[in-house]
Structures are given as C-alpha cells and as structure tokens.
Amino acid sequence: MSDDDFMQDSDQEYDFEYEDDEEEDTGDVDIENKYYNAKQTKTSDPEEALQEFLSIPPLEQEKGDWGFKALKQAIKLEFKLKRYQEATEHYEELLTYVKSAVTRNYSEKSIDNMLNYIEKGYDDPKAVQCIEKFYSLTLQCFQSTNNERLWLKTNIKLARLLLDRKDYHAVARKLRELHNACRKSDGTDDPSKGTYSLEIYALEIQMYSETRNNNQLKVLYQKALKVRSAVPHPKIQGVIRECGGKMHMSEENWKEAQSDFFEAFRNYDEAGDLRRIQVLKYLLLTTMLMKSDINPFDSQEMKPYRNDPRIFAMTELVDAYQRDDIYRYEDVLQKNTDLLADPFIAENIDEVTRNMRTKGVVKLIAPYTRMRISWLAERLRITEPEVMDILSFLIVDGRVKGRIDEHKGVLELESREDADHVQAITVLSEAVGNLFNAVFKSTDGFQPGQGDFMNSMADQSADIGSLDDTMRSMGSGKRGRRVGLTQRAY
C-alpha cells in the first residue's frame, strides 16, 4: 500500500469516528430536549409529561444523568396522580442508578429530596404504604454503600412515620437502633452526630408525650436541652419545646408551660411551620391559667398575629377572661365548638372555665348574706350541683365564710359582725369556766404561795368587766344582724 493509499484510509477512518461522536452528541441533545419539553408540559398535561419522562431512560445506551432525572420527575408525577404502585416500581429502578450512573453526593441529595417530597402524602392511608416501601427500598440500597448519613436520615423518617401511625413498640425499637448508631464505642453520644441525636430525642419526646409517660419525658427533655454539639433545625426545637410545655401543663406548672410554648411558637414561626398557630393557642391558654392580666400580644414576635382569624376565638376568650365577663366567655365557647376539636385544649379548658365560674360566684355573692343556690345557678347558666361544688371549694379554701344548707338549697354567709359576736361569747364562756373552777372547786381557801393565782383571777375579773360592754351591745348587734340577713337573693 502506498503512502497516499494509507493516508486516504486514515482520513476515512477519522471521518467515520467523528461521525459517530456527532451522532452521540445529537442523541444527547435529543434526550435533553425531550426532558425539558416534558418539564414544560407537566403542569398543563401531566399525563403526556409522564409518558415523555418514562420514554427517556430506554433512549440512553448506558444509564446516565438524563435517565436519572427523568425517572425522578416521573415518580413525583405518579405520586401526585396517586399511582403509588407504579411510583414504587420506578423508584426501585431509580435506585439502580445510584451506584454507578451518578455521583454519590448527587444521588444522596436527590434521594433525600425525593423522600422529603413524598412525606407530604401522610394524610392518605394508601400513600403511607407506598412511603414505607420507599424507606425500605432506600435502606436496602444504601446498606451496602456505607452511606451512614442517608441511612440515618431515612431511618429517622421511618421512625416518624411509625410514630404518626402510633405504632409505639416499633417506634421504640427503631429509636434504640438510632441511638446506638449515634454513640461512640464507649457508649457516650458522638458529638459529630449531634444534629441527628437531637432529632431522635425529639421523636422520643413526642412518643412519651403521647403515651403520657411523664417520668421518661422529663429525663429526655432535660437531655435534649443539654445537647450543645448540634445546630438544630428550628422545627426540631419547636417540637421539643411544645412537648415540654405539655409536660409542664400536666403538672400544673403554668409559668414553665408558658415559657416553653412561647419558645415553641418562636421556633415554628422561624421555620415557617403551620404548627405555630396551634402552639399560639396553647400559649393563650396558659395566659388564662396563670390568671395573668398581661396582654400576650404585646411581645414583638406575637404582634403580627393579633388579628389573625385563625386564633380569633382564643383571643376573644382571653379578653373575656381578663375582663371577668363570664357571659361573654361562655358565649365564645358555645359559638366556637371547633376549639375543643384539639384534645389538648379540650382537656385544659375546663380548668379555665372553672376559674371563670369561681370568679363569677365570688362576684355575685359579695353583696348578700343569704341566697338560694338555684338563683346562683340561673345567673351563671350552670347546674346547681356545679354551683355547690364551687361553693364547697371556696368555703374549704377559706375564701368564703359561710355554710350551705343542702336541705333548703341556701347559702348563708357569716357577716363580720356575726364573727365578732361568736368570738365574744367564746371568750366569755372560757372566763366563766375558769371562775367556776377557782371558786367552787377550791375548798381549802387560799394558801400561801398562791399569789400568782390571785393575780390571774384579777386579770380574769378585768376580762369579765370588759365583756360587760360587749354583752350590753349584743342587743343592738342582734338588731344589726337581723337587718343584715334581710339582704337576700332568691
């Protein structure tokens, strides 16, 4: 072969290789165009977009970025269209790309975002089964890749799913596994995994809060507050503080509960979490339980929510409570029954209502010395047994001086004048008793050494003398008492 023939063959070979590269580039461009065209139509025509995305992976000679991206979009669309079985199958296909087709960091971030996306479907029972399958497939896939971060994140999400399902035994097992993964070989917490530890504590605190295990809740709550090696997401801090507030409420520690609910509200607000509205209601609830006259909306963080319609009913309740307006308070409760849809509010509002009615009773009985229980019940719009219960508490507590005649259904109050008369008679009775003992039981006369006794007798005589005036005034006192008792309410 001549040199010219050789050069000609070489040129032909070179041209052929160049043409192959050009065809490959053209193929990539076609796939890219197909991908972006599908993205543009996924809102207007999700069905067409879904078919376009699913047609991309077979076009690649080897698994690559465009197939990975197309499958991600297809799975999200299928999940949105509630085609959970198809979404699960394509997610399983997507996981085959993570070992070689895409980089480790990109695959980890993409999978984590995908799991965050599907978490929005917790309200649909069918979606929950699909979500759990996604978690299971993810853990199986990354178990062999030694990707601890994604393993921890996925297991935390799975524990949260189990908690939402109230499968507490499964949650407890999963949390033990996670705690062990966040500890060093000597059993102490690993500072490098502080953020994960705090998330795990938050889940465990939620579990004990829901199961009313206050002993364990206290221990974990204190542990969580002492974690300093983490930069927690404000939502996690909000969860911890909210559970802390509920714990303090169960112990009737209103002040600490208010402090924790405020911190929970502030953190949820910072995270943009809608839970802030519910916690704000709890904060207003503790304001009433503390019997505080301070307007909670004076704080900088709460001012923007002063006129928020979502908390209008609670704001009205607080205003009525602070004004001692029992009628308005009861009207707000009757017109806003949805307030009691929250079990926590329903459980604690009774204490506020009782305080409100107690203040109403004290206010009503103030001008009178005698009144019927039925009259009080009618004025307060409650039953007679409820009035009796409140009055009994006030009498035992010493805030009301009086007695209840259950047979007649009447409350009789002691006036100040009545109390003075009773005290005077008591002193007189004791003095007469002492005099009787001295005069009639001493048969041997006065003996030497009884000077102290004589002095004592002189003092008693003085006491009796001073009581004469009191006894003389009892006639007019009785008249005054009779006048007082005519101040009645029936």
UniProtKB/Swiss-Prot annotation:
The keyword Nucleus applies. Gene3D superfamilies: 1.25.40.570. Keywords: Cytoplasm, Nucleus, Signalosome. It holds the Pfam family PCI. InterPro entries: 26S_Proteasome/COP9_Components, PCI_dom, WH_DNA-bd_sf. Residues 1-32, 469-490 are annotated as: Disordered. One of its GO terms (cellular component) is COP9 signalosome. Residues 1-30 have a biased composition (Acidic residues). PROSITE patterns: PCI. SMART domains: PAM, PINT. Component of the COP9 signalosome (CSN) complex. Component of the COP9 signalosome (CSN) complex that acts as an regulator of the ubiquitin (Ubl) conjugation pathway by mediating the deneddylation of the cullin subunit of SCF-type E3 ubiquitin-protein ligase complexes. The CSN complex is involved in the regulation of the circadian clock through its control of the stability of the SCF(FWD-1) complex. Belongs to the CSN2 family. This is COP9 signalosome complex subunit 2. It comes from Neurospora crassa (strain ATCC 24698 / 74-OR23-1A / CBS 708.71 / DSM 1257 / FGSC 987).
